[in-house]
């Protein structure tokens, strides 16, 4: 009987593939400001929010769901104030965790300032504690601020409300830091996002070789390495993003901007204003929130540092 039920289930999935994986809807009010003006999530809807602060050539993103909040990366020391300002304006007083994709200054150096501004439950890292000076500094700050440090690796899953973040750490010790960036696949209902750190071409090839194509597919793509590099075509086709966020302004990331324009993929830069992506698991509402003050989109807060 069980075998018959399994066969029947398989036949139903083959006959109605749309039922197996619901297609999410995108309401993009950044590209199309007047899109579906009457739409709003129901007051009791459980939501996942992803919000990008006004950082450029650096990464930080807030994820909130089910009364919990985390940061993925925390920008540089010079731009951490932009992160803490956003947290204050959005009413975030506690972060369950800060998850670091890789220990470069523009992704990890802001940890100390953020952890002094809000309560941080833990710092999660995917590299050895002594990997470089930025890791050593973060470990020292975590110790001084009594923030526990947890190490994560390939296949580990982090739960945020009813959302999950699955880590893909496919690089090896011979790869450079950017190439070894942890990639996080976010799932919430049928909605998905891919957060890619600063991964480069080699990482994309490795993901294609080790992750099933259907697992790579994502509605939202955080474009890797601040839009400075072209994507591998096969990787892009596997992900097939409906919307992409570039953590930069409109002048520096020429390759990413050009590539997405060629692919006719909607995208947004993280300055000026906050890029907000909210979903109930079926629909993404994408809009730009107006902060208390706008940063100059052509002015970098960082002097280029040794990564």
Residue positions per predicted region:
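Sec-dependent N-terminal signal peptides of Gram-positive bacterial secreted proteins and lipoproteins
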Residues: 3-21
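Secondary-structure boundary/capping motif
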Residues: 79, 106-107, 134, 176, ...
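Internal alpha/beta domain cores that form substrate/cofactor-binding pockets in large enzymes
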Residues: 106, 132-136, 145-148, 197, ...
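Hydrophobic/aromatic beta-strand patches that form the interior of the parallel beta-sheet core
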Residues: 51, 99, 124, 150, ...
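Short histidine/acidic/glycine/proline-rich micro-motifs that form metal-
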Residues: 126-131, 173, 250-251
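Active-site metal-binding motif and surrounding structural segment of the metallo-beta-lactamase
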Residues: 66-70, 78-128, 210-228, 240-245
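Short amphipathic alpha-helical segments and helix-helix/interface helices
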Residues: 84, 111-115, 136-142, 183, ...
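Core dinuclear metal-dependent hydrolase active-site scaffold
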Residues: 21-94, 143, 151-216, 273-307
């Amino acid at each position: 009987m069980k075998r018959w039920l399994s066969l029947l289930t398989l036949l139903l999935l083959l006959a109605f593939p749309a039922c197996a994986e619901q297609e999410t809807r995108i309401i993009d009010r950044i590209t199309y400001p007047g899109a579906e003006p009457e739409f709003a999530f129901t007051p009791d809807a459980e939501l996942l929010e992803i919000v990008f602060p006004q950082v450029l050539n650096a990464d930080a993103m807030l994820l909130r769901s089910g009364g919990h909040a985390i940061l993925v990366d925390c920008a540089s020391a010079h731009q951490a104030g932009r992160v803490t300002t956003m947290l204050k304006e959005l009413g975030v007083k506690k972060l369950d965790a800060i998850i670091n994709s890789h220990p470069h200054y523009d992704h990890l150096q802001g940890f100390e300032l953020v952890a002094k501004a809000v309560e941080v439950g833990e710092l999660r890292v995917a590299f050895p504690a002594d990997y470089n000076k930025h890791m050593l500094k973060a470990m020292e700050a975590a110790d001084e601020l009594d923030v526990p440090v947890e190490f994560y690796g390939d296949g580990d899953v982090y739960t945020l409300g009813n959302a999950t973040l699955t880590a893909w750490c496919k690089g090896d010790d011979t790869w450079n830091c950017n190439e070894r960036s942890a990639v996080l696949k976010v799932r919430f209902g049928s909605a998905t996002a891919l957060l890619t750190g600063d991964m480069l071409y080699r990482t994309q090839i490795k993901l294609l070789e080790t992750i099933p194509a259907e697992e790579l597919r994502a509605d939202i793509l955080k474009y890797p390495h601040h839009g400075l590099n072209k994507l591998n075509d096969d990787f892009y086709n596997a992900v097939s993003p409906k919307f992409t966020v570039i953590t930069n302004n409109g002048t520096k990331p020429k390759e990413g901007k050009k590539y997405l324009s060629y692919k006719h993929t909607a995208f947004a830069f993280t300055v000026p204003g906050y890029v907000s992506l909210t979903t109930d698991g079926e629909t993404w509402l994408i809009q730009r929130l107006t902060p208390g003050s706008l940063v100059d989109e052509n002015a970098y807060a960082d002097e280029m540092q040794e990564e």
